[in-house]
């Protein structure tokens, strides 16, 4: 059941600390029931993120999509076309609901993100083409196109930003890759500036994934079985994210940035993603309470949003004072024989594969629905 709690003091405090609250979920029901509008009005939600898994769950349920599916079946569209028409319709509707936020914040918030086809994660040119098509299909100024931070995704980010399209860079797990993402963004801004595009119209976030880092490293710490290993559980993800913020501060105080800022460029904000706690031993608001820093975004599932409203512990900046401890924690993990580079590479590969599976499941579900309504579903 979709509900809106009246406990919002913690969410107001989080917003006041400079953290933009985005909802990591979207469905036709959430739009048509008025729930999304309620969350914006009463729970400080100022943006929405989607991904293939979210759309697979929403459209796979069928709820709210029957009429559009019937229309698409009559028109004889392909499965891929049907999926894109349904997902972009949801994103367009959400963008319209969030448009007042977009206008009030000068484009900083009020954003809705939609991801390129995950099957293209290792194809630069196809990703660029898909990003341009999605921006055209949604046709709203407050859409952000999600491009994965794979090696092939990096030049696509530069190209798409260079065209003046706002981008949410997703699936970032490592500090090295995050620096490459920021470099790709700055290169895109430089390209846009050279082409005479107004930099003030370009916004970007870099989605740094959090809880999955703990899930994998904690599993390896448990295998180590020592007291030292046990003491490090639940620390790696926060350490990783805090050091990412340190890198953000460094890059956006550097010469490349200071050359772009006078032209109206916006910093690429860090976005904390995968902030739902997966280990029941941890407080369910851990990745919200402990990642409060100015100029960030935290996109959270509704359960985490409600938990933060109810019993979150928002008490100022919990990031910038922790860089030395963060480095110490990651170094301690390495000393136990757990390779940081190996973990983050595995997480990236698994995340891309997971979204490919979800997209395949979505295509299959839509094909079945189209066939059931008289289309061939090819």
Curated annotation (Swiss-Prot):
Q: Which GO terms describe its biological process?
A: carbohydrate metabolic process; pentose-phosphate shunt
- Where is the major localization of this protein? cytoplasm
GO CC annotations?
Answer: cytoplasm
Enumerate the GO terms in the molecular function aspect: transaldolase activity
**Localisation per UniProt entry:** Cytoplasm
The entry's active site is: 146 (schiff-base intermediate with substrate)
Q: What is its EC number?
A: 2.2.1.2
Which Gene3D superfamilies does the record match to this protein?
Aldolase class I (3.20.20.70)
Keyword hit for Transferase: yes
Q: Which UniProt keywords apply?
A: Cytoplasm, Pentose shunt, Schiff base, Transferase
Claim: Cytoplasm is one of the keywords in the record: yes
Q: Which HAMAP family match?
A: Transaldolase_2 (MF_00493)
Which family does the record assign? Belongs to the transaldolase family. Type 2 subfamily.
The protein's name in its UniProt record: Transaldolase 1
Species, as recorded? Streptomyces avermitilis (strain ATCC 31267 / DSM 46492 / JCM 5070 / NBRC 14893 / NCIMB 12804 / NRRL 8165 / MA-4680)
